[in-house]
């Protein structure tokens, strides 16, 4: 998943970006109490796996937190497979979620040349097509009992919280949390004070995320 708020270009080290349109990932059945929005599919993760966050660097702590909260299981063990979208697909591994849905503020890994990824622009995110998509995903989740929306990072917060106004929705517990990428966790560690380890912030991120999952308006 893209981890910067500005359109800074970064090379994808594992081949060309496919430009895969990654749909929201819902449970096959049952309630959906929370929906989680990231920024966009990452070049080595969801762009290859076609599942939000799956194989993205920031997706690892997210899926670990969901697994600890009994919100996800995997079709095969993960311990022998590299955390990478293409590798996970090749190994036949898929997540099976319950009570939670996963999506992104923008459904395609943004790129200008097929090799470098960047953050989605506000114009891209606020396009009529993209807004219709996000509203449809939210409506689907509401029909299944949605009461919590969690966004990762400032870019997704701009679309969901500001542009679509969910921050002021009385029927939704709306939360923004730091993006759990290495850069995001390093920022948390710096803000926490000198000597605080990134691994400690990863655990703290998971704790806060679990609280948000269970929150209600």
Would you name each region that the model predicts?
Residues 1-148, 155-164, 172, 182-186, ...:
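A polyanion-binding, active-site-adjacent surface
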Residues 69-73, 167, 212-216:
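Solvent-exposed amphipathic alpha-helical surface segments
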Residues 169-179:
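Short hydrophobic/aromatic-enriched beta-strand-loop microsegments
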Residues 192-215:
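A polyampholytic, Gly/Pro-enriched intrinsically disordered region
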């Amino acid at each position: 998943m893209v981890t910067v708020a500005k359109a800074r270009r970064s090379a994808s080290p594992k081949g060309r970006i496919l430009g895969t349109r990654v749909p929201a990932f819902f449970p096959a059945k049952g309630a959906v109490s929370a929906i989680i929005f990231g920024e966009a599919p990452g070049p080595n993760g969801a762009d290859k796996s076609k599942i939000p966050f799956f194989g993205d660097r920031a997706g690892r702590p997210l899926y670990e937190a969901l697994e600890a909260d009994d919100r996800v299981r995997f079709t095969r063990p993960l311990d022998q497979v590299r955390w990478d979208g293409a590798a996970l697909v090749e190994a036949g591994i898929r997540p099976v979620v319950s009570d939670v849905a996963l999506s992104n503020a923008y459904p395609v890994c943004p790129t200008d040349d097929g090799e470098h990824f960047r953050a989605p622009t506000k114009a891209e995110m606020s396009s009529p097509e993209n807004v219709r998509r996000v509203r449809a995903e939210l409506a689907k989740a509401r029909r299944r009992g949605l009461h919590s929306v969690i966004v990762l990072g400032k870019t997704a917060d701009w679309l969901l919280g500001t542009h679509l106004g969910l921050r002021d929705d009385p029927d939704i517990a709306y939360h923004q949390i730091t993006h759990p990428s290495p850069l995001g966790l390093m920022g948390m560690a710096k803000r926490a004070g000198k000597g605080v380890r990134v691994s400690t912030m990863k655990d703290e991120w998971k704790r806060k995320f679990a609280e948000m999952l269970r929150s209600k308006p």
